[in-house]
């Protein structure tokens, strides 16, 4: 009996067409499940990188305020806006790498009480002398902003704000 089984195994040349089709179908099902999951992970990683860049921008603005008192809001009702280009030009931050590969819109290099018309910026506001920071970071396709299109406060930064 053992010799008969060995003989049959030696005579078997390969897999049948049905067996090959079954393997291909199984691999197709596995890839159909796995690919969307992997793409979702990649997108979430990019969103997390945008959030990290926004935090880096806020930290740079904090350094700028410490070094330049003219960047502090004049009163509780008037915020100060500091563009990404201003932070880069003054050496508070290196050029920020956009995970989407497009490059961030850096703005016009201004800092003051006028809201920038375009580009990325940090908004510095004061409440009873306590400074708070909000960030708007855009690359033309995706931006860090709230549902109304306004800058996101520092304590609310998350991947949900990447729109």
Regions found by a protein language model. Give the residues of each.
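N-terminal leader/signal peptides at the extreme start of proteins
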Residues: 1-15
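Aliphatic-rich helix starts adjacent to a transmembrane/signal segment
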Residues: 12, 39-59
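N-terminal single-pass transmembrane signal-anchor helix
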Residues: 13-39
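Mobile, glycine-rich extracellular loop/lid and propeptide segments
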Residues: 66
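Extracellular/periplasmic head regions of type IV pilus-like filament subunits
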Residues: 73-129
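Short, surface-exposed interaction loops/tails
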Residues: 114-163
């Amino acid at each position: 009996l053992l010799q008969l089984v060995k003989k049959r195994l030696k005579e078997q040349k390969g897999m049948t067409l049905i067996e090959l089709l079954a393997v291909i179908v199984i691999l197709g099902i596995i890839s159909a499940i796995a690919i969307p999951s992997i793409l979702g992970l990649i997108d979430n990683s990019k969103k997390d990188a945008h959030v990290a860049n926004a935090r880096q921008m806020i930290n740079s603005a904090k350094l700028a305020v410490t070094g330049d008192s003219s960047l502090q809001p004049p009163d509780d009702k008037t915020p100060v806006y500091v563009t990404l280009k201003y932070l880069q030009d003054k050496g508070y931050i290196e050029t920020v790498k956009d995970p989407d590969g497009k490059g961030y819109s850096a703005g016009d290099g201004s800092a003051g009480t006028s809201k920038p018309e375009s580009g990325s910026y940090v908004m510095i506001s004061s409440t009873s002398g306590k400074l708070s920071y909000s960030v708007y970071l855009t690359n033309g396709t995706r931006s860090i902003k709230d549902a109304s299109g306004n800058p996101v406060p520092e304590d609310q930064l998350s991947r949900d704000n990447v729109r």
